Swiss-Prot record:
Cross-link (Glycyl lysine isopeptide (Lys-Gly) (interchain with G-Cter in ubiquitin)): 86
Upregulating conditions: Expressed in anaerobic conditions. Down-regulated by heme and the ROX1 and REO1 transcription factors in aerobic conditions.
Keyword RNA-binding (UniProt): yes
Name assigned to this protein: Eukaryotic translation initiation factor 5A-2
Gene: ANB1
Entry's family note: Belongs to the eIF-5A family.
Species this chain originates from: Saccharomyces cerevisiae (strain ATCC 204508 / S288c) (Baker's yeast)
Length: 157
């Protein structure tokens, strides 16, 4: 018998959190990874090919989790990583200790998403305190998740 210990931290199938895409194929409102962060492209421009070199693509992006502005300048022929971004809606069950308690469509509970801060968090807490049924939109990319919006759930009378 071997004395080695095997630890498996997470149970994904080894799928990548990103895929490569050529700079020239990126589009405004699309997603891209800049400095290791998943970002949404808010503005992009291309410069002409210079005397020595390639056309450049200038990207202005916002981090999808922090809202921080990040910029990048790359040759149009280079590949950049694009994150797989997933949006899911969950029913809000409770807000406790800064975390959301959510229910998936198949009845499972999910308690590992942080409650949003700032105006979104305050208005979500206020609507929840009023007893409204809320649906929360969660965005997930590259192993991170965050609540980005909420709406009142439709009444099923």
């Amino acid at each position: 018998m071997s004395d080695e210990e095997h630890t498996f931290e997470n149970a994904d199938a080894g799928a990548s959190a990103t895929y490569p895409m050529q700079c020239s194929a990126l589009r405004k409102n699309g997603f891209v990874v800049i400095k290791g962060r998943p970002c949404k492209i808010v503005d992009m421009s291309t410069s002409k090919t210079g005397k020595h070199g390639h056309a450049k693509v200038h990207l202005v992006t916002l981090d999808i989790f922090t809202g921080k502005k990040l910029e990048d300048l790359s040759p149009s022929t280079h590949n950049l990583e694009v994150p797989f971004v997933k949006r899911s809606e969950y029913q809000l069950l409770d807000i406790d200790d800064g975390y959301l308690s959510l229910m998936t469509m198949d009845g499972e509970t999910k308690d590992d998403v942080k409650a949003p801060e700032g105006e979104l968090g305050d208005s979500m807490q206020a609507a929840f305190d009023e007893g409204k049924d809320l649906m929360v939109t969660i965005i997930s990319a590259m192993g991170e998740e965050a609540a980005i919006s909420f709406k009142e759930a439709p009444r099923s009378d």
